[in-house]
Amino acid sequence: AFGTILKALAKIAAKVVKKLATKPGATYMLKQNLQ
């Protein structure tokens, strides 16, 4: 059951990343996270 939850979270995270990637602020957010 725990594995399925992790898979679901991974899918959601991938969707969020794709949405952020289309926005101009994505590069700014990535730079902030890398620092």
UniProtKB/Swiss-Prot annotation:
It is found in: Secreted. The keyword Coiled coil does not apply. Its main location: secreted. Signal peptide: none annotated. GO terms for cellular component: extracellular region. GO terms for molecular function: toxin activity. Transmembrane segments: none annotated. Keywords: Amidation, Secreted, Toxin. Expressed by the venom gland. The modification Glutamine amide is found at residue 35. Belongs to the cationic peptide 04 (cupiennin) family. 02 subfamily. This is Cupiennin-2b. It comes from Cupiennius salei.
